[in-house]
UniProtKB/Swiss-Prot annotation:
SUPFAM superfamilies the UniProt entry points to: HD-domain/PDEase-like
Catalytic reaction annotation: tRNA(Gly) + glycine + ATP = glycyl-tRNA(Gly) + AMP + diphosphate
GO cellular component: cytosol
Species whose genome carries this gene: Baumannia cicadellinicola subsp. Homalodisca coagulata
Protein name per the record: Glycine--tRNA ligase beta subunit
Family: Belongs to the class-II aminoacyl-tRNA synthetase family.
Keywords: Aminoacyl-tRNA synthetase, ATP-binding, Cytoplasm, Ligase, Nucleotide-binding, Protein biosynthesis
Enzyme Commission number(s) of this protein: 6.1.1.14
Organism superkingdom: Bacteria
This protein's record includes keyword Ligase: yes
A GO term for molecular function: glycine-tRNA ligase activity
Pfam short name (any one): DALR_1
């Protein structure tokens, strides 16, 4: 069967740069689905994307689709034939609808039985007659991915207005009309360089013709790599280093057809401004790449990418430096206005900003945070005064001009202004770290003072929003960042090993709202919500659901959260030891079967066998030791001590008849076993563990 190369290029107005890769990959995925649905085999497929085009090149595509069959299942054999083996009316009617006789039908068998079936060969069309409709189908699915524009008299809909449609199978133009445009072999080159209109003779020539004649690097990855390599070359020339922001690199790649990388500079006096503000305006406003020294300090240079090759690059550099100077002058202006007063002077202005309509102002929140952070600081044994100070001024930078213009650097600006005001290093750092972690897997606050402020801020948000029943916890997204806040609190407490219990923390946060909250079950709801987040977090870490549930069953919110973590790790450890897991299963299963017979304490006067005496004495002695382990959160050590009773317990089971006819003895022996079970229950409810082994990929 002859194989061909197929090319489709959709020429458009400028596509959204931040979405270009996603759009190209989505178009490709849609077209692959069309190929598969039509039974068309191919070798491989390449996608191309540039600011004004999306393209796909399919290599070694078959000219004729593979044969496909349409199946029509008939009645089951036991209903298709009567006792004499003659077709029933049901079988005859089904066959008539298929245009065959019952004798022409095939049979197929599954584990559920045998049926009649009719397989009909579906008539296939040549690939040439399918390609245009396949492309159209792939393009019309974009409305589910992104915002769509409308244009033309017939109100065509696509991401951006379409100007050209190129469909080539080898050197043959595939006829068709998409968005009111007839397909042809015309592709457009660079707007200002090379050939603006190119007639493409063969599908295989596509990327090279655009490169050589059109001055367009259609290959997205090649264009991106070209930019990256040239940035590194230019940075070395000025003796600097760069931290290439991949999101910025992706966006710049999507903005240019023919990338030319150049270096420019700005006045070093601007470096007195907080570096993050300069970097923000360079990367986000101008799409420039900052340059750093070997220690990571910002240098007065930047790298930029232009979309045109010029004999006078100096003019381009000067133009970009002029734009950059204006941008940095704006930043300097905002900075100078802000520094006319101290950070703490913005505190009372927070009284003019609502935190939430029913929850008061940001000033109210700041006073709550001051108290809550102090309370947390005392529990975790860090500096109470510094935690209180950091929390009180933590929202002040929200009232500054800098944060108003560049909201993404809130907290960072607070840190710099606090430092300039002479606040302690701990207080200043907490301004930045109060928002950590920003996302799943993000870094945590580095100091205990920062931890106290971060937990206080997140817990205040949860208490307030749940307290007025404004939570949206069932939505796929997280509009009020409640899930993120809950997970942040949990991660900080557990990973930093802070001795905080959830119930006290939630109670304190709710109490500080001073009766503003209307939800009477707010504490219970927050606990339930946070424990669900805890379960999800541990699942993602590789713990099995039954292990988590076993610990969750005995955990009380009044207990320290770090003890939950210690219990979980202990149970996970136990599940790697087969004989240990078998021991717990045996103990819990016996009690589960005879729980109605258990009546409490062991009667020592009924101990008749030495194995009974040895076991109960061992339990009594061990209990005192375990209490110390439990108080210190050493659950793995405690569990190991319990497992070390294995030989004594196994001897008890092998030598003692538990279900003896003497009911009094029977109950007493069950009480002994229950004593062992109760010690295990302090750690987890092992009866909830399934037979499957715990995953071993947990850190």
């Amino acid at each position: 069967m002859k194989q061909h190369i197929f090319l489709v290029e959709i020429g458009t107005e400028e596509l959204p740069a931040k979405e270009l890769r996603r759009l190209a990959q989505y178009f490709t995925a849609n077209f692959i689905n069309e190929l598969n649905a039509n039974g068309i085999n191919y070798n491989d497929i390449n996608w191309f994307a540039a600011p004004r085009r999306l393209a796909i090149k399919v290599n070694s595509i078959n000219s004729i689709p593979t044969k496909s069959y349409m199946e029509k299942r008939g009645p089951a054999i036991n209903k298709a034939f009567d006792a004499e083996g003659k077709p029933t009316p049901a079988a005859i009617g089904w066959a008539r609808n298929c245009g065959i006789t019952v004798n022409q039908a095939e049979r197929f068998t599954t584990d559920k039985g045998e049926w009649l079936i009719y397989r009909m060969l579906v008539e296939t069309k040549p690939v040439q007659k399918l390609l245009c409709s396949m492309v159209y189908n792939a393009l019309t699915k974009f409305s589910s991915l992104t915002k769509i524009m409308r244009w033309g008299e017939k109100n065509y809909k696509f991401i951006r207005p379409v100007r050209t449609i190129t469909l080539l199978l080898d050197d043959l133009v595939i006829p068709g009309n998409i968005f009111g445009i007839d397909s042809n072999r015309i592709i457009l080159g660079h707007r200002f360089m090379g050939e603006s209109v190119i007639s493409l003779l063969h599908a295989d020539y596509y990327p090279n013709v655009l490169l050589e004649r059109g001055r367009v690097i259609a290959d997205y990855e090649l264009r991106k790599d070209t930019i990256r390599r040239n940035i590194e070359i230019m940075v070395k020339k000025i003796g600097g280093f760069t931290k290439i922001n991949d999101k910025l690199l992706e966006e710049v790649t999507s903005l240019v057809d023919w990338p030319i990388v150049l270096t420019a500079s700005f006045n070093a006096n601007f470096l007195r401004i907080p570096a993050e503000a300069l970097i923000y305006t360079m990367e986000n406003n101008q799409k420039y790449f900052p340059v750093y020294d070997a220690k990571g300090k910002l240098l007065p240079y930047f790298i930029f990418v232009t979309n045109i090759e010029s004999t006078n690059t100096n003019q381009i550099v000067v133009g970009n430096e002029k734009v950059m100077r204006s941008r940095l002058a704006d930043v300097e202006f905002f900075f100078n206005i802000d520094r006319k007063q101290k950070l703490e002077d913005y505190l009372l202005l927070l009284g003019q900003v609502k935190f939430q309509m029913e929850l008061g102002t940001l000033l109210d929140k700041s006073y709550r945070l001051e108290i809550l952070a102090s309370w947390i600081a005392e529990i975790i044994s860090t500096d109470i005064k510094q935690a209180a100070r950091a929390a009180l001024i933590s929202k002040c930078d929200l009232m500054t001009q800098m944060v108003f213009e560049y909201p993404e650097i809130q907290g960072i600006i607070g840190m710099h202004y606090a430092t300039l005001d002479g606040e302690t290093e701990l207080v200043a750092l907490a301004q930045k770290e109060q928002y950590l972690p920003l996302f799943s897997g993000d870094n945590l606050p580095t100091t205990l003072v920062s931890c106290a402020v971060s937990i206080a801020d997140k817990m205040d948000n949860l208490a307030g929003i749940f307290g007025i029943n404004q939570q949206y916890t069932k939505q796929a997204n997280d509009p009020l960042a409640l899930r993120r806040a809950a997970l942040g609190i949990l991660r900080i407490i557990i990973e930093k090993q802070l001795p905080i219990d959830l119930l006290s923390l939630i109670d304190k946060a709710v109490f500080l709202y001073n009766k503003k909250l209307t939800n009477t079950i707010v504490v219970e709801q927050i606990i339930h919500f946070m424990l669900n987040r805890l379960l999800s977090w541990y699942k993602k870490q590789g713990y099995s659901i039954d292990t988590i549930n076993a610990v969750m069953a005995v955990y009380k919110p009044t207990g320290k959260l770090i003890h939950f973590d210690a219990r979980l790790r202990a149970v996970h450890y136990l599940r790697q030891i087969p004989h240990a897991e078998n021991l717990t299963k045996r103990i819990f299963n016996i009690i589960a079967k005879h729980k109605d017979l258990i009546n409490g304490e062991v009667n020592f006067t009924l101990l008749k066998q030495p194995e009974e005496v040895i076991l109960i004495n061992s339990i009594t002695q061990l209990h005192k030791k375990l209490i110390l382990f439990f108080e210190k959160g050493k659950y793995q050590e405690a569990l190991w001590e319990l497992i070390n009773l294995r030989e004594i317990i196994n001897t008890f089971f092998s030598k003692i008849i538990i279900m003896t006819e003497n009911k009094e003895l029977c109950i007493n022996r069950l009480n002994i076993i229950n004593k062992v079970r109760q010690l295990f229950l302090i750690i987890a409810d092992f009866s909830l563990l399934q037979c499957s082994k715990e995953k071993s990929n947990v850190d």
